[in-house]
């Protein structure tokens, strides 16, 4: 049954943005995509594990157009599935101490972000941006840094790609908040209006920004990501160009 639960969570679709970042970062840093596959799978499993918990906290019954794990199997089995995903993920990172450190630090940031969202909600734009960095940016950063590590990149390249991805992650979260407030649930593949219904901090709820102004903030983050990427030697490769495209895409996506 646990295997069914793991398959339900990990094979139910999704954008697979984080593993894509891992593979592209590896190529941009001079590595082969094959070198980054394990790390890419691992970071997606970590992300999926966090979504299981998110859905329990939010009481969201739908994820990626299908039943959320807790809705399908119950709270206990869903939590066990989340633990199982993390176990599988760390098995993929365990051969590389640097990878273990990167992911562990990202998970601490992610946990702090979730705790902040529940217990000490942000009250202004600055606090919101810090929440977005922890809640979403940290795992994006880890995805890119893992790719750079897989390519045996130097510390400067690891940091530059990490900065790029963290900024993309923040832009992604801002756009996610805007979509929650403005998109159609069927188009988005998950319930909308959740932030307002649950009094959950979002860029729309916390600040006085209109959706259009929030989108501009997302574009500012995307531009900062592009600036960071421009300092990487491999930024003009095909993989680097795909990373550029991603930074531009996350702020205009519709789901």
Name what the model sees in each region.
Residues 1-255:
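All-alpha prenyltransferase/terpene-synthase fold signal
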């Amino acid at each position: 049954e646990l295997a069914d639960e793991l398959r339900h969570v990990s094979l139910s679709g999704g954008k697979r943005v984080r593993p894509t970042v891992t593979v592209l970062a590896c190529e941009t840093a001079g590595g082969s995509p094959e070198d980054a596959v394990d790390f890419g799978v691992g970071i997606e499993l970590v992300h999926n594990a966090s979504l299981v918990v998110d859905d329990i906290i939010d009481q969201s019954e739908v994820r990626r157009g299908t039943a959320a794990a807790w809705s399908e199997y119950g709270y206990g089995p869903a939590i066990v599935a989340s633990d199982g995903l993390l176990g599988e993920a760390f098995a993929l990172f365990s051969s590389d101490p640097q990878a273990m450190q990167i992911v562990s630090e990202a998970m601490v940031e992610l946990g702090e972000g979730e705790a902040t969202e529940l217990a000490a909600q942000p009250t202004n734009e600055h606090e919101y941006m810090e929440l977005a960095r922890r809640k979403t940016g940290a795992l994006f950063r880890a995805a890119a840094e893992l790719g750079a590590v897989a390519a045996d990149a130097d510390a400067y390249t690891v940091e530059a790609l990490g900065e790029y991805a963290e900024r993309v992650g923040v832009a992604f979260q801002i756009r996610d908040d805007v979509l929650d407030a403005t998109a159609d649930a069927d188009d988005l593949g998950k319930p909308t209006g959740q932030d307002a219904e649950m009094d959950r901090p979002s860029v729309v709820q916390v600040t006085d920004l209109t959706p259009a102004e929030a989108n501009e903030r997302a574009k500012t983050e995307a531009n900062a990501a592009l600036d960071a990427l421009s300092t990487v030697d491999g930024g003009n490769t095909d993989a680097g160009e795909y990373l550029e495209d991603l930074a531009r895409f996350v702020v205009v996506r519709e789901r």
